[in-house]
Amino acid sequence: FGVTCLFAFSPDSKQVAFVRLDETNVPSFEWQTFLNDEGMMMYPQTHSLRYPKAGEANATASVCVYDIYYKTIKTMQIPEHMNGYVPRIVWTPIPAPTKADAQPMSDLVVLHINRDQNKMDVLKGNPKSTVCRPFYSEQSNKYFVNYELFDQWQWLADGRVVVVSEKGGYQQAYMYSVQGVEQRLLTPGECDVTQVYGVDEKAQVLYYQVANTPMIRQAYALNMKKNTTTCLTQGEGTHTLYFSKDWKRYVDC
């Protein structure tokens, strides 16, 4: 799934979320080796690896949170029917304090994919209570679900999310509320959003790249307040932008 590790520190660095695999019920596969770098070995070596062949039990994945101060581990309450893959875990930004919640916490977001890889579910979990609730779901009856688009999602400080999906036939960006309700399509048109650079939350501007044709990719800025779009690049070819942290400057490569 394009990852070499599955752990993530919370924005305040007080907790670490990680995926744990339990291979207790996975049968062991054994084999022998007779050669090493020096040639034939006098005594062969036996190796063992837990490997689930077709029809055998797979390793079960669980999402856990380690509290660095209290040195405790909590297991998030993922629904039992979700026994597939967990290729991504991320933390949401820390919300602004309110009168009702003076010390708000980040949520833990869990991406789950079924074994057929044609259905993806996104859960938002409370690391304190370990309760997870459904936030987003997408399923295809013909193709696999492009879970890699999850890496393009933008989690805003006010709880909203810019979701990138192919559900409408084209790869487009949508705005979702903090409850996981679709609010509107941000990038209408018969073309694909190939990259989301990010959101200037202060100015409420979304920066992204669009494949107008297979040979041309331009960069755009969408003012989400005024619902106006500005093309930032000119000329043919592929334009890839690299922005400064304050979103005031960029390099066009």
Per-region residue spans from a language model:
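Non-catalytic accessory segments flanking enzyme active sites
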Residues: 15-21, 26-29, 56-62, 73-76, ...
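Active-site proximal loops enriched in glycine and acidic residues that flank catalytic Cys/His/Asp
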Residues: 78-80, 112-114, 126, 136-139, ...
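Leucine-enriched alpha-helical scaffold segments used for protein-protein interaction
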Residues: 172-173, 185, 228
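Predominantly five- to eight-bladed beta-propeller fold
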Residues: 1-8, 15-69, 73-75
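Beta-strand C-termini and the immediately following turn/loop, strongest in propeller blades
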Residues: 5-9, 17-23, 53-57, 92-93, ...
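Short loop/turn segments that connect beta-strands within beta-propeller blades
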Residues: 67-71, 126-128, 177-181, 223-227
